[in-house]
């Protein structure tokens, strides 16, 4: 469905440290990291091992303007189990994320929807969900 998604950050090092640990809990691996101080380009991408796409990217905005977290914008990662949802959520909170909705069933979406919501260290809203 998606080629990639890009989430803007201001403090790249803090965001990179946060996502490196959180995405590891989802089984994603770092595909690349680019730091070009001269051009002020800092970005990184993760993927499922052995699969070229989709990519989850973080980076400073290319227009060099400050990053602003969007209201109503969210990235949702697919977990393989409810236990994985809980692990990712707990990892996110221990690494500086903030709660936007503890892990649990959300039957108003569908009977088996189990998700958790948090904000990353930059204020971006993130969801982790499984559908079993």
Predicted regions and their residues:
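N-terminal beta-strand motif that seeds the catalytic metal site of vicinal oxygen chelate
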Residues: 1-16, 75, 131-132
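Core segments of cupin and vicinal oxygen chelate
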Residues: 8-53
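Vicinal oxygen chelate
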Residues: 10-14, 75-116, 121
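Short, solvent-exposed loop/turn elements at beta->coil junctions and helix N-caps
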Residues: 35-36, 63, 103-108
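Long, continuous compositionally biased terminal/linker segments
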Residues: 38-84
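Active-site beta-strand termini and strand-to-loop segments that position acidic
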Residues: 45-51, 118-121, 131
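Conserved beta-strand in the GNAT
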Residues: 54-60, 117, 126-130
């Amino acid at each position: 469905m998606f080629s990639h998604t890009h989430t803007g950050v201001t403090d790249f090092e803090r965001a990179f440290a946060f996502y490196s640990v959180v995405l590891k809990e989802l089984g994603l691996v770092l595909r690349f990291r680019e730091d070009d101080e001269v051009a002020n380009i800092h970005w990184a991408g993760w993927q499922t091992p052995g699969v070229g796409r989709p990519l989850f990217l973080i980076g400073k905005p290319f227009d060099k303007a400050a990053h602003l977290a969007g209201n109503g914008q969210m990235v949702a990662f697919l977990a393989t189990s409810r236990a994985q949802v809980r692990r990712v959520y707990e990892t996110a909170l221990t690494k500086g994320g903030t709660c936007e909705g503890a892990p649990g069933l959300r039957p108003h979406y569908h009977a088996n929807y189990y998700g958790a919501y948090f904000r990353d260290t930059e204020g971006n809203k993130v969801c982790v969900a499984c559908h079993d």
